[in-house]
Amino acid sequence: MLSVQNLEVVYQDVILVLRGVSFEIPKGKIVSLLGSNGSGKTTVIRSITGLLDIQNGDITKGTISVDGEDITNEKPSKIVEKGIAQVLEGRRIFAELSVLENLRLGGHTSSKDIPQNIDRVLDLFPILKDRSKGEAGYLSGGEQQMLAIGR
């Protein structure tokens, strides 16, 4: 279960962005976060995925945990290992590169782990394995989204 309790985020030590945000998401559930512009959706997601830094004072209060384990101070790469990820609206792939080249340009992974991670992605999305050498720009929209998630 993902649990966010009493999250507070302040930018530049003066701008209160979020206050008292609390919710729980049962394991295995897929959710979307809806709200008006400027309501803090992206800030909540960035907090959960480790892209806001508690050390720099961005997250000033609250706890984010997965299955009871506090991840508030964890790096994004450790949070991904817990099964927490963000799917961006834009696909953010390089159309002129192959599927494999796009996956190699992935995230915060050491170079020795890249082959293993690529294999994991291709196991998750077998359709990409069949198209791994082709240019990403020729993938369908759904396949491009799978590639973006894999990256």
Can you annotate each of these PLM segments?
Residues 135-139, 143:
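Conserved ABC ATPase signature
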Residues 34-36:
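The feature captures the beta-strand-to-loop junction immediately N-terminal to the Walker
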Residues 2-4, 18:
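Conserved structural motif at the start of ABC-family nucleotide-binding domains
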Residues 59-69, 116:
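Conserved ABC transporter NBD signature motif
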Residues 12-13, 31, 52-55, 97-116, ...:
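ABC-type ATPase nucleotide-binding domains, specifically the catalytic core motifs of the NBD
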Residues 31-32, 86:
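Short beta-strand immediately N-terminal to the Walker A/P-loop
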Residues 49:
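Helix-to-loop junction immediately C-terminal to a conserved catalytic motif
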